[in-house]
């Protein structure tokens, strides 16, 4: 089961389910139906049942899903049992905000190292996280065995930095730059373009709200 590939769309929804199951656990709720889950996470119940079906029988007809069992299952699937160290490259405004946030103990993810080209940042500590000079990046990533990097550098530098990350053996890049990176097939990239997301949101407001459809 661990090696079975599931659709990417399903994989993207798993953390959403996991987060809400944690909410249910904190509320001491013992079971949940696909309909209740659907209303909470805004994914239709048929899609939820199909997503869950990739992993076998996770629930019981007429009973729903046992929250504790489902939470334990997804914790394993999402590799939440061990701490994952993440690096951040680019300590500008966005990078600094992410360092301050540092996932706030909500997950098993921690930013444990940061890198920047600015000399005044070299060998300093921000929000409890050491900042290294960019020339030490490849060495530090290898020594600290960091596989995942958050990229918040200016777009003009993005591909060059990505090439260095590949050299360092990084397996995943969360890319906040507007550049679509060219990387080997064994490196996963998730693109987050805040400008695109806002433009899409504005388009939806103008074209898909009740006031705009007349």
UniProtKB/Swiss-Prot annotation:
InterPro entries: CoA-bd (IPR003781), NAD(P)-bd_dom_sf (IPR036291), Rex_DNA-bd_C_dom (IPR009718), Tscrpt_rep_Rex (IPR022876), WH-like_DNA-bd_sf (IPR036388), WH_DNA-bd_sf (IPR036390). NAD(+) binds at residues 90-95. Pfam families: CoA_binding, Put_DNA-bind_N. Keywords: Cytoplasm, DNA-binding, NAD, Repressor, Transcription, Transcription regulation. Residues 16-55 bind DNA. GO terms for cellular component: cytoplasm. One of its GO terms (biological process) is response to redox state. The keyword Calcium does not apply. The keyword Transcription applies. It is found in: Cytoplasm. One of its GO terms (molecular function) is DNA-binding transcription factor activity. Belongs to the transcriptional regulatory Rex family. Modulates transcription in response to changes in cellular NADH/NAD(+) redox state. Homodimer. This is Redox-sensing transcriptional repressor Rex. It comes from Limosilactobacillus reuteri (strain DSM 20016) (Lactobacillus reuteri).
């Amino acid at each position: 089961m661990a090696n079975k590939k599931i659709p990417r769309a399903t994989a993207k929804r798993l953390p959403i389910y996991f987060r809400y199951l944690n909410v249910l656990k904190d509320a001491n709720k013992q079971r949940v139906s696909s309909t209740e889950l659907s209303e909470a996470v805004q994914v239709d119940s048929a899609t939820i049942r199909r997503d869950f079906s990739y992993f076998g029988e996770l629930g019981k007809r007429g009973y729903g899903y046992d929250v504790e069992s489902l939470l334990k299952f997804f914790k394993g699937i999402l590799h939440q049992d061990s701490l994952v160290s993440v690096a951040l490259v680019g300590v500008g405004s966005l990078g600094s905000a992410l360092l301050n946030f540092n996932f706030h103990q909500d997950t098993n993810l921690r930013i444990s190292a940061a890198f920047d080209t600015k000399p005044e940042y070299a060998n300093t500590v921000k929000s409890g996280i050491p900042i290294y000079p960019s020339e030490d990046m490849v060495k530090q990533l290898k020594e600290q065995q960091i596989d995942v990097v958050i990229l918040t550098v200016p777009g003009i530098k993005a591909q060059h930095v990505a090439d260095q990350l590949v050299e360092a053996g990084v397996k995943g890049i969360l890319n906040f730059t507007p550049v679509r990176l060219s990387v080997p097939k064994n490196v996963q990239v998730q693109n987050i373009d805040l400008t695109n997301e806002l433009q899409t949101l504005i388009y939806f407001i103008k074209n898909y709200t009740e006031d705009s459809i007349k």
